[in-house]
Regions:
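A glycine- and small-residue-enriched flexible loop/hinge segment at structural boundaries
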Residues: 75, 79-102
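Hydrophobic residues in beta-strands of the RecA-like P-loop NTPase core, especially within AAA+ ATPase
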Residues: 28-29
Length: 356
């Protein structure tokens, strides 16, 4: 099973470096195991058609599929840093490592190889740009929590397009010391920072390199869950669309684009099934954007969809040989989205949570 992971990586290296595919999409569903996918398809079938069965996602209809184990070099249960490193480099490492080996030496990533081969490169996510999975493609640090240091690696990689919720520690080092803001550093390195989809459209034409994050004041750690989304919120599909737009403008030698559905994992940590299924569907919507591009360039495009690991041990079944997935249609917010505005200490004496 270890060979399957390496095979995936070496296939990517081959198509990027040897010109077998001009355009490469690498979608990663963080925490997305088999049951997260199956559950989403069953959930869709019951909600859309009122029947037991599956309503297929686009990516489950792709012609080639396989399975792989996910243990790291040091742990039976990996984390996103070690798993992201494996997906980015083809090498196993210790938990918390960002594209360094067990001796803490940097390992070259497939994105870096693509850049050296003359491709444009994009690294995107629905969580923060300095989070473990996206970081594994452009940074080399001994600990995933070194957010400031990871952000400093971003301009060193010199990739063309980055996108996500924002940056977690833009002015604070790993040892909690005050540091210069990363944003002027990005700008000095030639990056244009766009805040929101409309700002991207206004700035992209004149930008040489782009960092797309959420609007000022939004939570920098992530995009909102799909189930909580408001009209003006940035989406993973918009990020994918923007990345394609940016990476194909000007001299077009092809691109390598990594897109992470990072909050599948977060919803699984919360044991929030309705939010999980909505997040898987949301990543599928981003894959549809790539698929529309593929239909215009079918002989030049490769789309790979994978996961770094499964989260939560989700089980589809009960002791009564039944699932009540339709009950989840009544959930209108994530557990996280509901808990933030609800504070039991602020309820008036005559109120209950049902009143809010």
């Amino acid at each position: 099973m270890k060979k399957l992971v390496y095979t995936l990586f070496f296939v990517l290296i081959s198509v990027v470096a040897n010109g077998q595919a001009k355009y490469v999409f690498y979608f990663i569903g963080d925490g997305m195991g088999v049951n997260q996918v199956n559950g989403t398809e069953m959930f869709q079938a019951e909600l859309q058609n009122g029947r037991i069965g599956v309503e297929p996602l686009l990516f489950t209809q792709f012609p080639v599929a396989t399975m792989a184990t996910t243990f790291s070099a040091t742990n039976s249960v990996t984390d996103s840093a070690a798993a992201g490193t494996a997906l980015a480099t083809g090498k196993k490492t210790y938990n918390h490592a960002i594209s360094v080996n067990e001796e803490k030496n940097a390992i070259q990533t497939v994105a870096e190889k693509a850049k050296k081969a003359g491709k444009k490169v994009g690294v995107t996510t629905s969580v923060s740009v300095d989070h473990a999975t996206p970081a594994a493609f452009y940074a080399h640090q001994p600990d995933r929590n070194m957010y400031y240091e990871i952000a400093l690696d971003l301009p060193k990689a010199n990739f063309d397009f980055y996108a996500g919720g924002g940056f977690l520690k833009p002015t604070t080092t790993f040892d909690n010391k005050k540091a210069p803001s990363i944003f002027p550093i990005f700008e000095e390195a030639g990056y244009t920072v766009a805040r929101g989809y409309n700002d991207y459209k206004a700035k992209s034409q004149n930008a040489e390199k782009m960092i797309l994050i959420q609007e000022e004041g939004a939570n920098p750690s992530c995009l909102p869950y799909a189930i909580d989304r408001k009209d003006n919120d940035l989406t993973l599909a918009q990020i994918t669309e923007s990345a394609i737009d940016f990476l194909t403008k000007g001299k077009n030698k092809g691109f390598f684009l990594m897109v992470e559905g990072g909050k599948i994992d977060w919803a699984c940590h919360a044991n929030d099934a309705a939010t999980v299924f909505n997040e898987v569907k949301d990543m599928d919507n981003a894959i549809k954007v790539a698929y529309e591009f593929y239909k215009k360039h079918p002989k030049e495009t490769l789309i790979v969809v994978t996961a770094d690991h499964e989260t939560g041990g989700i089980v589809l079944g009960t002791g009564k040989y039944a699932l009540n997935l339709k009950a989840l249609q009544h959930q209108k917010h994530s557990a996280d989205g509901l808990s933030k505005p609800v504070s039991y200490t602020h309820l008036r004496a005559h109120e209950t949570c049902a009143d809010l």
